[in-house]
């Protein structure tokens, strides 16, 4: 894709995610059956957090595209570095994780993650917008342009910090209300929940490393700026 086409693509995807972030929280806002869905805000659902994260990433990517055309590549290194860090450590791993875990649980027993009653309020296209299209958008981004990956230590630490923060959010929600964010946790013992959270981090860390492999396969080694010695 040309630079102009890439810029237009990022702009269109950004607007798609802006629309989803506005539209989905409005669905069934006054419906009693969806009170639990709306109570507590979007931060309790990884799916909705991911949509917000994707909007932020594509916003930064769009800004990076525009600034490169206006003031040049060398003058916006911070924006480009932030774009790459955001994509490699969060946007790609988390969107892929949501896609894989949701559809695995959905096909095993949808009541564990997306009860059938939600179909009365969320059309199929909304479900796929939240849980399906997020993956091809992220995968396409990996082959659209090279991304400079941080060190594995830094990348996995940042990903782990996000994972830990979200676990705290889930547990805090349970302490406050006595209800789990996702029905799957109702069927697990305390040990099972610990194993689930541990397996989730192992999976998302594996996705991070897989994304790094794809980046290397498509673009080869990307030289990192050398740190100046004092």
Swiss-Prot record:
InterPro entries, A to Z: ADTRP_AIG1
GO cellular component, as recorded: caveola; cell surface
Residues annotated as site: Important for catalytic activity: 47, 131
Topological region Extracellular: 29-45, 107-120, 176-190
Membrane spanning residue stretches: 8-28, 46-66, 86-106, 121-141, 155-175, 191-211
Major location category of this protein: membrane
Superkingdom per UniProt: Eukaryota
Compartments where located: Cell membrane
Keyword set includes rRNA-binding: no
Known EC number: 3.1.-.-
Membrane topology: Multi-pass membrane protein
Record's keyword terms, sorted: Cell membrane, Hydrolase, Lipid metabolism, Membrane, Transmembrane, Transmembrane helix
Cytoplasmic topology ranges: 1-7, 67-85, 142-154, 212-230
A biological-process GO annotation: cell migration involved in sprouting angiogenesis
Disulfide bond sites: none
Example GO molecular function: hydrolase activity
Catalytically driven reaction(s): 9-hexadecanoyloxy-octadecanoate + H2O = 9-hydroxy-octadecanoate + hexadecanoate + H(+); 12-hexadecanoyloxy-octadecanoate + H2O = 12-hydroxyoctadecanoate + hexadecanoate + H(+); 9-(9Z-hexadecenoyloxy)-octadecanoate + H2O = (9Z)-hexadecenoate + 9-hydroxy-octadecanoate + H(+); 12-(9Z-hexadecenoyloxy)-octadecanoate + H2O = 12-hydroxyoctadecanoate + (9Z)-hexadecenoate + H(+)
Family: Belongs to the AIG1 family.
PANTHER family: ANDROGEN-DEPENDENT TFPI-REGULATING PROTEIN, ANDROGEN-INDUCED PROTEIN 1-RELATED
Function per UniProt: Hydrolyzes bioactive fatty-acid esters of hydroxy-fatty acids (FAHFAs), but not other major classes of lipids. Shows a preference for FAHFAs with branching distal from the carboxylate head group of the lipids. Regulates the expression and the cell-associated anticoagulant activity of the inhibitor TFPI in endothelial cells (in vitro).
Protein name in the entry: Androgen-dependent TFPI-regulating protein
């Amino acid at each position: 894709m040309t630079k102009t086409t890439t810029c237009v693509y990022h702009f269109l995807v950004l607007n798609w995610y802006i629309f989803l972030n506005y539209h989905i929280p409005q669905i069934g806002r006054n419906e009693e059956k969806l009170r639990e869905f709306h109570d507590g805000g979007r931060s309790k659902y990884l799916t909705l957090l991911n949509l917000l994260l994707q909007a932020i990433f594509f916003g930064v990517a769009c800004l990076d595209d525009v600034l490169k055309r206006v003031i040049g590549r060398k003058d916006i290194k911070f924006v480009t570095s932030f774009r790459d860090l955001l994509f490699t450590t969060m946007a790609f791993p988390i969107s892929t994780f949501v896609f894989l875990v949701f559809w695995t649980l959905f096909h095993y027993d949808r009541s564990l993650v997306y009860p059938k009653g939600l179909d009365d309020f969320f059309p199929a296209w909304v479900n796929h917008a939240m849980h399906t299209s997020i993956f091809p958008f992220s995968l396409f981004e990996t082959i659209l342009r090279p991304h400079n990956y941080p060190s594995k230590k830094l990348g996995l630490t940042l990903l782990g910090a996000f994972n830990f923060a979200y676990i705290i959010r889930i547990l805090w929600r349970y302490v406050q209300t006595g209800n789990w964010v996702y029905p799957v946790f109702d069927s697990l013992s305390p040990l099972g929940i610990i194993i689930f959270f541990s397996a989730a981090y192992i999976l998302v860390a594996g996705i991070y490393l897989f994304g790094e492999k794809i980046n290397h396969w498509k673009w080869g080694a990307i030289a990192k700026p050398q740190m100046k010695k004092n």
